[in-house]
């Protein structure tokens, strides 16, 4: 009997010690990982920029923050969104695109003589001159070439364009529930000029630079820039 009681006490002591070790050593890392995953899934995450479509504002392989809670979209914000529901030429291949919001629902967008207009107001495109680039020049693989895009508006872009998604055909303004986006590196960016409008429901989040990034980069991915999206009238 005494031996049985002793064995039971030893077993209880072993399991008690094992539980304490679990709570002390194993549980904290599990909780930390759980908190990090919850934050990344629901609130904030980061992305690695792939390609040069947002150059010079964002560089290839640069890390950017993603705010998944911000659904109050503004002109000038940089966003990331799922490509396959918006770009019919992606053939279902899932990628995340990073572009800048140019037009909101109801906006008219046009390009004339090298200047971009939204609702007849000229857009501030100073971000094109970052890294010493001429504002009216586009950088491609280390060489400079003029922007040769013809003048256009949403109606002319969407009429008879086989690459446009179905909800983008024959539209004179940005449809409800969608956005018109462009990459800062206009000469190489695959964006709304080629596949049409982006559904808001496919947007992952609003992107911003990290605190240690270049000062101008941070400005052109911040609310300070969105508040100065249009060229100020003199």
Located regions from the model:
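N-terminal capping/interface segment
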Residues: 1-12, 37, 42, 51-52
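Soluble "head" domains of membrane/secretory-pathway proteins
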Residues: 2-20, 27, 60-234
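Alpha-helical transmembrane signal-anchor/signal-peptide segments
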Residues: 45-60
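Hydrophobic membrane-insertion alpha-helices, especially the h-region
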Residues: 24-42
């Amino acid at each position: 009997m005494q031996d049985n009681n002793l064995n039971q006490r030893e077993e209880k002591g072993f399991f008690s010690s094992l539980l304490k070790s679990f709570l002390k050593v194993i549980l904290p890392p599990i909780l930390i990982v759980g908190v990090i995953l919850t934050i990344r899934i629901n609130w904030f995450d980061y992305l690695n920029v792939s390609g040069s479509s947002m150059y010079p504002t964002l560089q290839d392989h640069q890390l950017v923050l993603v705010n998944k809670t911000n659904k109050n979209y503004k002109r000038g914000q940089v966003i990331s969104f799922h490509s396959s529901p918006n770009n019919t030429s992606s053939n279902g291949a899932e990628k995340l695109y990073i572009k800048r919001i140019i037009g909101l629902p109801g906006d008219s967008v046009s390009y004339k003589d090298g200047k971009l207009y939204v609702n007849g107001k000229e857009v501030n495109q100073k971000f094109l001159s970052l890294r010493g680039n001429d504002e009216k020049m586009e950088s491609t693989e280390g060489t400079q070439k003029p922007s040769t895009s013809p003048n256009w508006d949403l109606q002319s872009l969407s009429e008879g364009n086989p690459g446009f998604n179905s909800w983008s055909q024959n539209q004179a303004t940005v449809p409800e529930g969608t956005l018109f986006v462009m990459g800062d590196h206009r000469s190489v960016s695959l964006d709304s000029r080629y596949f049409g409008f982006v559904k808001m429901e496919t947007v992952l989040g609003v992107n911003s630079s990290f605190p240690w990034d270049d000062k101008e980069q941070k400005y052109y991915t911040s609310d300070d820039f969105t508040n100065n999206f249009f060229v100020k009238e003199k």
